């Protein structure tokens, strides 16, 4: 069964937007995470963002070739699974080191669907249609960093910082299906 173009655009935009949500959505929680996981040196908690970005960078290099070898769908599922598992570890982290390692893996996991979504657009469309679809996806990618901190702050109003990672887990696994 082939999905419609609007559904495809929405799915690809959500996969790409996960990266921005994973970084910007947790910004309101950073002081709380620092207070709990590294109270003696709260500035080290900023490494939580860096480790995700490093994971994304590493994952970006390998996920494209892996999707050529093993198939697009498998890499999307693998990346989404790693992302969800890592978000769960982040949620339960009791040390900064555990959090940093989990965020590194989460970045690698996020890279899979992000890279494959761009590849799928190029696989399925060309010319002006590809440019049009890519522009819709990039509009969403550009808007999400502005909205993600508000989402994170909204979660922090009602719950502890771990809830931000709990929100990341089911959201991502639903998108993979």
Residue ranges and their predicted role:
Residues 58-97:
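Conserved MFS/SLC helix-loop-helix module at the cytosolic interface between two early adjacent transmembrane helices
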Residues 80, 84-87, 102-103, 172-176:
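A generic transmembrane-helix signature of 12-TM secondary carrier transporters
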Residues 7-39:
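Extracytoplasmic
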Residues 102-141:
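Cytoplasmic helix-loop-helix junction between adjacent transmembrane helices
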Residues 30-57:
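Extracellular/periplasmic helix-loop-helix junction of adjacent transmembrane segments
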């Amino acid at each position: 069964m082939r999905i419609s173009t609007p559904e495809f655009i929405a799915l690809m935009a959500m996969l790409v937007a996960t990266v921005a949500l994973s970084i910007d959505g947790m910004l309101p929680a950073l002081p709380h995470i620092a207070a709990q996981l590294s109270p003696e040196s709260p500035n080290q908690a900023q490494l939580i963002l860096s480790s995700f970005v490093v994971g994304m960078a590493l994952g970006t290099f390998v996920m494209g070739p892996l999707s050529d070898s093993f198939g697009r769908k498998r890499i999307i599922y693998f990346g989404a699974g790693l992302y969800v598992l890592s978000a769960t570890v982040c949620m339960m982290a009791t040390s900064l080191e555990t959090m940093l390692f989990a965020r590194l893996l989460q970045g690698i996991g996020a890279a899979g669907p992000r890279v494959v979504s761009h590849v799928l657009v190029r696989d399925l469309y060309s010319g002006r249609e590809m440019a049009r679809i890519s522009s819709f996806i990039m509009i969403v990618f550009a808007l999400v960093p502005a909205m993600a901190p508000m989402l994170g702050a909204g979660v922090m109003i009602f719950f502890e910082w771990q809830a931000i990672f709990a929100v990341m887990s089911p959201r991502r696994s639903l998108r993979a299906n």
